[in-house]
Regions:
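Internal anion-binding site segments
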Residues: 96-168
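Donor/substrate-binding cores of folate-linked one-carbon enzymes
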Residues: 1-101
């Protein structure tokens, strides 16, 4: 009678796909949320029903955002079911022009490219925490990176400030 309903961990139509939580952090989004939607044959393209939004903390990680969104999803699903039962649910088609895709995460994504700017690296470390995680190679050994901070140029010593980006 109603079809299948899904709780998706993004504010659709942004971040359709398997990695919406992590990509929101990696891309520096200021907010995220959950969306209830009708399922269809195409991934995350069904009509939307309800959304709930959360502001991302400046040090938000993939894990911390996952935990926040998981706490929001259940109550939103219950509200959606109530609206479906009483006939007040409204189907909202997704705008294709606003859609983005959040691809599946791969372990290789965590290999830090030290030529990226510092802000991008910091968001990557936060977004991929704790899985798949980030890492680098130092003297042939793999080193996991769990946290990092971007420092202001003014706080560096003269030799640190003169170092090539990516110097560890």
């Amino acid at each position: 009678k109603y079809g299948c309903i899904n709780v998706h961990a993004s504010l659709l139509p942004k971040y359709r796909g398997a990695g919406p939580i992590q990509w929101a952090v990696i891309n520096g989004e200021k907010e995220s949320g959950v969306t209830t939607m009708y399922m269809c044959r195409e991934i995350d393209k069904g009509d939307m029903l309800l959304k709930d939004t959360v502001t991302l903390d400046p040090k938000e990680t993939g894990d911390s955002l996952h935990d926040k969104l998981s706490m929001m999803g259940g109550p939103l699903l219950l509200k959606t079911i109530d609206q479906l039962e009483d006939g007040s649910a409204v189907r909202i088609p997704q705008c294709e022009e606003e859609s983005t895709y959040a691809p599946k995460l791969e372990k290789t994504m965590g290999n830090i490219d030290w030529t990226m700017d510092a802000d991008r690296i910091e968001r990557l470390v936060r977004g991929l925490n704790s899985w798949p995680g980030t890492f680098t190679k130092i003297h042939g050994k793999t080193v996991k990176i769990w946290d990092c901070d971007v420092v202001c140029q003014e706080t560096l010593t003269e030799s640190q400030a003169a170092a090539t980006p990516g110097t560890v």
